[in-house]
Regions:
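Functional-site microenvironments in short loops/helix caps that host divalent-cation chemistry
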Residues: 1, 40, 44-46, 98, ...
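Disulfide-stabilized, aromatic/cysteine-rich ligand-recognition loop
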Residues: 1-19, 182-183
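Short Gly/Pro-enriched turn/cap motifs at secondary-structure boundaries
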Residues: 1-3, 22, 57-58, 177-179
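A short glycine-rich, aromatic-capped structural motif
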Residues: 8, 23-88, 107-110, 191-192
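Non-transmembrane alpha-helical segments in soluble domains
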Residues: 12, 70, 75-82, 113-120, ...
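A general structural signal marking secondary-structure boundaries and capping sites
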Residues: 15, 85-86, 123, 148
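Short, flexible turn/loop "capping" segments at secondary-structure junctions
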Residues: 58-61, 96, 169-170
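Surface-exposed intrinsically disordered loops and tails
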Residues: 91-94
Length: 194
C-alpha cells in the first residue's frame, strides 16, 4: 500500500481507571478516561468550508469508555518506544527534530501500528490480559474531540492562531504539545498541530 509519512497520532487504551505510562526514566505517556455516551458525529451540510466528502450528521453511541492520549504522541515518546526497532524505522523521523515535546510526524499508519506493537510488548507486564494500546476509532476520536460540543470546533465556530496551530496560522511548523488550551475533556491539540 501507499505510505503517507505526514501524519501524527494519539494512543488509545482499552481499560478503565486512571492510566499513566512510564516509557523510560524521563518520558511518560498521559492518558485521560472518556466516559461512554451518545453524540452527533459528522458535520451539517450547511457548515462553512465543509468538504463534500464529509459524513453527514448522525447519532453514534459509544457503549464503552476508553482512554486516549492527553496529547499527541511526542517525539520523545516515539523515540523511547521505537529506539532499537528491527523494522528499519527511524526513532526520530520528524521534519523538526530535537524538539522532544513536539508531536512526532512523518510517520505512516503502518509506522503507528509498529509503535503500538512495540508499546504493547514493552508494557505487557503493566496491562491486564486482553487489553491493548490501539489507535482510537474515528468515532472515539471525534467524540473526544467534540467534548460534548456541537460547534465546528470544541470552542466555537471560528479558528485562529490563538486557539490552534493550523495551516494558515503563520507558524509553518509544529508547536510543543499542550501549547494551546485544552478542550472541555482536557485533551490538547485536537484541532491542529499534526
Amino acid at each position: 500500500g501507499t505510505r503517507y509519512n505526514d501524519m501524527g497520532f494519539r494512543v488509545g487504551f482499552q481499560f478503565t481507571g486512571e492510566h499513566s505510562v512510564d516509557l523510560n526514566a524521563s518520558v511518560q505517556l498521559d492518558m485521560l478516561w472518556v466516559e461512554p455516551g451518545t453524540f452527533t458525529m459528522g458535520s451539517p451540510t450547511t457548515e462553512a468550508d465543509r468538504q463534500a466528502d464529509r459524513e453527514d450528521e448522525h447519532n453514534v453511541t459509544l457503549t464503552k469508555g476508553f482512554y486516549l492520549g492527553k496529547y499527541e504522541v511526542t517525539q520523545a515518546q516515539y523515540e523511547a518506544v521505537m529506539t532499537g526497532n528491527t523494522d528499519s524505522l527511524s526513532a526520530t523521523p520528524s521534519e523538526w527534530p530535537n524538539n522532544p515535546n513536539r508531536p512526532v510526524e512523518k510517520v505512516s499508519w503502518v509506522d503507528a501500528q509498529i509503535f503500538l506493537t512495540r508499546l504493547n510488548a514493552q508494557q505487557s507486564a503493566n496491562i491486564p490480559a486482553g487489553w491493548a494500546y490501539v489507535l482510537p476509532t474515528e468515532s472515539q476520536w471525534e467524540y473526544a474531540c467534540r467534548a460534548g460540543t456541537t460547534t465546528m470546533y470544541s470552542w466555537g465556530n471560528d479558528i485562529n492562531a490563538t486557539r490552534a496551530n493550523y495551516n494558515v496560522s503563520g507558524l509553518s511548523q509544529t508547536r510543543d504539545v499542550g501549547y494551546y488550551a485544552a478542550n472541555p475533556l482536557g485533551f490538547f491539540d485536537m484541532h491542529g498541530n499534526v
